[in-house]
Amino acid sequence: MPYQYPALTPEQKKELSDIAHRIVAPGKGILAADESTGSIAKRLQSIGTENTEENRRFYRQLLLTADDRVNPCIGGVILFHETLYQKADDGRPFPQVIKSKGGVVGIKVDKGVVPLAGTNGETTTQGLDGLSERCAQYKKDGADFAKWRCVLKIGEHTPSALAIMENANVLARYASICQQNGIVPIVEPEILPDGDHDLKRCQYVTEKVLAAVYKALSDHHIYLEGTLLKPNMVTPGHACTQKFSHEEIVMATVTALRRTVPPAVTGITFLSGGQSEEEASINLNAINKCPLLKPWALTFSYGRALQASALKAWGGKKENLKAAQEEYVKRALANSLACQGKYTPSGQAGAAASESLFVSNHAY
């Protein structure tokens, strides 16, 4: 029988559980603003804006200083390393800005995906080296939760057993290191929407991946009440010719989660996976209205699905600040309602809100 050496004190556990609950309090979700310098370059390029440190700071400030209507909608914000140490125009560090609006500060801690030798183009995620020291420093600098993204692809022979096992293990090591440092880990095993697979295949793979992840978290003695899961919704591949209804997507998603995610997990914060802003809100709303028993908070951790319209409205011009913030507030309010199952699409979504945000082989 394995013997359990106490990994966390009752005080540490309470702190982690409290942080997780604050992030996914009713009506709240996460703004993922942790695009790496390379990823934000693509976003800025799409609006003809240069990728300078000042433009990145100004754009992040635009989101973080939106008016108080977003306060009841955003429980946490995930930042990239650079952004954690930037300041608003009034001199306040961004973590202070987030906390003043009732949000919890998060930080992306992985160092990106790398090829997994001996597989057909599959990957694992690097960044465990020195992670404990980085977490200790981030905690001092105001961060209370972290994110680590692993990526799996559906193909004829993928994901392989090796890729599933390796990524589950690396997520568990990351989660363990975070919890030792008082940081709530968001566990993100993203199954990419690339491919022509149907809904059933995605559901099957999602179940296998999540089962492996929670087995690894158990093996590594992770305190589940002090974690959040960031999964993909179960959807058909982008190249799948068969169309599936919102209801089918919802049933497949909730069923997969019910079969694999322990009720002890505090919250599930979905990634948008290249869905349009409107689609991401509609699906999240439908998931929350699903009549099956769902013991966790089911909310959002959206990047592009909260930012696309705001980015377009800003267009890199300072005079468009208010218009851009208005677009961001709109999406935040929509998703706040959606995570409570109270969202009714107005049918007036702008062009940007209905535009697919799919990028093949998406890397942060």
UniProtKB/Swiss-Prot annotation:
Residue numbers bearing the Phosphotyrosine modification: Y5
UniProt key word Hydrolase: no
N6-(2-hydroxyisobutyryl)lysine found at: K99, K147
E.C. number: 4.1.2.13
Reactions catalysed, as given in the entry: beta-D-fructose 1,6-bisphosphate = D-glyceraldehyde 3-phosphate + dihydroxyacetone phosphate
GO cellular component terms given for this protein: I band; M band
Modified residues (N6-malonyllysine): K111, K312
Subcellular location: Cytoplasm, Myofibril, Sarcomere, I band; Cytoplasm, Myofibril, Sarcomere, M line
Positions of crosslink type Glycyl lysine isopeptide (Lys-Gly) (interchain with G-Cter in SUMO2): K42
Keyword Oxidoreductase included in the entry's annotation: no
Self-association state and partner proteins as the record states: Homotetramer. Interacts with SNX9 and WAS. Interacts with FBP2; the interaction blocks FBP2 inhibition by physiological concentrations of AMP and reduces inhibition by Ca(2+).
Miscellaneous note of the record: In vertebrates, three forms of this ubiquitous glycolytic enzyme are found, aldolase A in muscle, aldolase B in liver and aldolase C in brain.
Family: Belongs to the class I fructose-bisphosphate aldolase family.
Protein name as catalogued: Fructose-bisphosphate aldolase A
Lineage: Eukaryota, Metazoa, Chordata, Craniata, Vertebrata
Name of the gene encoding the protein in the UniProt record: ALDOA
